[in-house]
Amino acid sequence: MDVVAGKALQVSDAVYSYQLDGKGGVTSISPDAVATAEQPCWLHLDYTHPDSAAWLQNTPLLPEVVRDGLAGESVRPKVTRLGDGTMITLRGINFNNDARPDQLVTIRVYMTDKLIVSTRHRKVYSIDDVLNDLQSGTGPTNSGNWLVEIVDGLTDHTSEFIEDLHDKIIDLEDDLLEQKIPARGQMALLRKQLIVLRRYMAPQRDVFSRLASERLPWMNDDDRRRMQEISERLGRGLEDLDSSIARTAVLSDEISSLMADAMNRRTYTMSLLAMVFLPTTFLTGLFGVNLGGIPGNTDSFGFATFCMMLVVLVLGVAWWLKHSKWL
């Protein structure tokens, strides 16, 4: 890449605009700054901001095929080499307010040894973590180190979210052991979160593996080794996701079984009640026809006698059901 001057990186509505000092810190990109491999410039943009969108479409620092990629629709994680630059798309857990974590945020990055251009729409907390390290003087020192720190933060947040989902599954299993059925939709939401995370984290692991194996000029051997370790860590998280998805399938079957048992018990109870009161209903209907000749209609104790007869009949039917082991 030709010389990258700070004057070409002045974007008024940029989220962040910094130059790494090569010692773990950052300085603002001044118009007189010159990006080097030892001190690359980092431009972090929200592609929905007007000046940022215009810069992405008009700057000569970006290849033509990269422009739409940095401001396009969300896609699955991938990495593409473009000459001396690399286009990377990654996904992360969404910790923004009023959003579910499984509604993943997207970060798109175009990198060379001298320039880092990253874009997003929704806030990515892993980037803020890296910026905090840079502002405290303990951050990455070059482009490759910057990328490793970003993917390390994304993977840490993903692992934490997977652990939270695992804890929810354990709680559901404990509740089912106590015959407690979860709230409607809770299991469906949990399975959706697991499946969505599995869908995007599997290709993201492949991206990390490729970055670790590619001989990118701006990544040294230590960066490649760390990238491979991060890929393996995410792979273990994917194994946990697979086992969690299988466990939720078992939980769904168990919940269906519990609900069916509860329905069967209610139906059985109603059937027994019908059997108990069917003879009494027949007799009360028979004696209620209001025709002449009904036994006891002239007896002052006729009603009491009839009620006692009904009680005896109910007790008799109940005894028979008990003796037949239906109760």
Curated annotation (Swiss-Prot):
Membrane topology, record value: Multi-pass membrane protein
CDD domains assigned: ZntB-like_1
Topology feature Periplasmic, residues: 293-300
UniProt GO molecular function: cobalt ion binding; cobalt ion transmembrane transporter activity; magnesium ion binding; magnesium ion transmembrane transporter activity; zinc ion transmembrane transporter activity
Species this protein is from: Yersinia enterocolitica serotype O:8 / biotype 1B (strain NCTC 13174 / 8081)
Topological domains annotated Cytoplasmic: 1-271, 322-327
One Pfam family here: CorA
Function in brief: Zinc transporter. Acts as a Zn(2+):proton symporter, which likely mediates zinc ion uptake.
Protein name stated in the entry: Zinc transport protein ZntB
Catalyzed reactions per annotation: Zn(2+)(out) + H(+)(out) = Zn(2+)(in) + H(+)(in)
Domain of life: Bacteria
GO cellular component terms listed in the entry, alphabetical order: plasma membrane
Subcellular location: Cell inner membrane
Cell inner membrane is among the record's keywords: yes
InterPro entries, per the entry: CorA_cytoplasmic_dom, CorA_TM1_TM2, MgTranspt_CorA/ZnTranspt_ZntB, Zn_transp_ZntB
UniProt record similarity statement: Belongs to the CorA metal ion transporter (MIT) (TC 1.A.35) family.
